Amino acid sequence: MQERHTEQDYRALLIADTPIIDVRAPIEFEQGAMPAAINLPLMDNDERAAVGTCYKQQGSDAALALGHKLVAGEIRQQRMYAWRAACLQNPQGILCCARGGQRSHIVQRWLHEAGIDYPLVEGGYKALRQTAIQATIELAQKPIVLIGGCTGSGKTLLVQQQPNGVDLEGLARHRGSAFGRTLQPQLSQASFENLLAAEMLKTDARQDLRLWVLEDESRMIGSNHLPECLRERMTQAAIAVVEDPFEIRLERLNEEYFLRMHHDFTHAYGDEQGWQEYCEYLHHGLSAIKRRLGLQRYNELAAQLDTALTTQLTTGSTDGHLAWLVPLLKEYYDPMYRYQLEKKAEKVVFRGEWAEVAVWVKAQ
């Protein structure tokens, strides 16, 4: 059976989104996994812990014997069924464990005995992880253009429309502000970095890439932080600033944070619970900046938010949200962004409305 073991092989796996059957324990998978991986563990968390303790106390032979004892009979049959189904569903896939050691080899052998020959990743997740880290360091050396602008300027959409754009917020599953959470939970830091590396590799492989187009982000996007190598390069990058009329920005924010989020919550949870989740989402976002707003201003805006939600529930109209959104932008978000932009004014190379910035970026 052909095994993958070169740097180019590892990169090819990430670029192709090759399905990976990851047989590590769930706790390991949650700490970090590759984008196209599915977790079908050889041992669950408790079994892995027991084998690990046995290894420390009695050595490798005893640990291996315990592992075979724990994963036997009906448990082994159930897991074999899952592995076999995954292999048949993903004939171009590959097995993976932590370091390409006993776990993936055991599963590979059991599958072979069942009539399925399936390759494994030599070096395992650790080798793929090192490839992802190295690829990000290497690809981050290419020139970068950042898209800046106040909240509601359509920066993310502009990045998404560029063939050399990488949507950092989309990969992080967070839009970067107090109201930035999405319905998808954020990945672990390692999984986010792996996903980013794979996206950069795929984007680079599709074209003769001369530069990256990224959104002007802070170091943190929700609970994820940008890799230091990329963040350092972004601090040196040229910035194109979108300066759209205030009314256009309000329309975008209404669509994104009120209409779309309400739709997404009700689609995920049903009308009643979805409405409660939507209300909690908006209140949580406002509460996150309570200290910066000051208690009195926060209470005023929170009351206006409650009124707007009542209006939206009874009439379907989101217009009432302008009563708290407009002052929030003018008193908090816009001054904050302008202050941040002033500190890097020498990096600004172009300013214009959304369409003008889009044309300028494509010409670079």
From Swiss-Prot:
The active site is at 97 (s-selanylcysteine intermediate). GO terms for biological process: tRNA wobble uridine modification. It catalyses: 5-methylaminomethyl-2-thiouridine(34) in tRNA + selenophosphate + (2E)-geranyl diphosphate + H2O + H(+) = 5-methylaminomethyl-2-selenouridine(34) in tRNA + (2E)-thiogeraniol + phosphate + diphosphate; 5-methylaminomethyl-2-thiouridine(34) in tRNA + (2E)-geranyl diphosphate = 5-methylaminomethyl-S-(2E)-geranyl-thiouridine(34) in tRNA + diphosphate; 5-methylaminomethyl-S-(2E)-geranyl-thiouridine(34) in tRNA + selenophosphate + H(+) = 5-methylaminomethyl-2-(Se-phospho)selenouridine(34) in tRNA + (2E)-thiogeraniol; 5-methylaminomethyl-2-(Se-phospho)selenouridine(34) in tRNA + H2O = 5-methylaminomethyl-2-selenouridine(34) in tRNA + phosphate. InterPro entries: Rhodanese-like_dom, Rhodanese-like_dom_sf, SelU. Belongs to the SelU family. It comes from Shigella flexneri serotype 5b (strain 8401). Involved in the post-transcriptional modification of the uridine at the wobble position (U34) of tRNA(Lys), tRNA(Glu) and tRNA(Gln). Catalyzes the conversion of 2-thiouridine (S2U-RNA) to 2-selenouridine (Se2U-RNA). Acts in a two-step process involving geranylation of 2-thiouridine (S2U) to S-geranyl-2-thiouridine (geS2U) and subsequent selenation of the latter derivative to 2-selenouridine (Se2U) in the tRNA chain. This is tRNA 2-selenouridine synthase. Keywords: Selenium, Transferase. One of its GO terms (molecular function) is tRNA 2-selenouridine synthase activity. The keyword Repeat does not apply. SMART domains: RHOD. Monomer. Residues 14-137 form the Rhodanese domain. It comes from the Bacteria. Its EC number is 2.9.1.3. HAMAP family: tRNA_sel_U_synth.
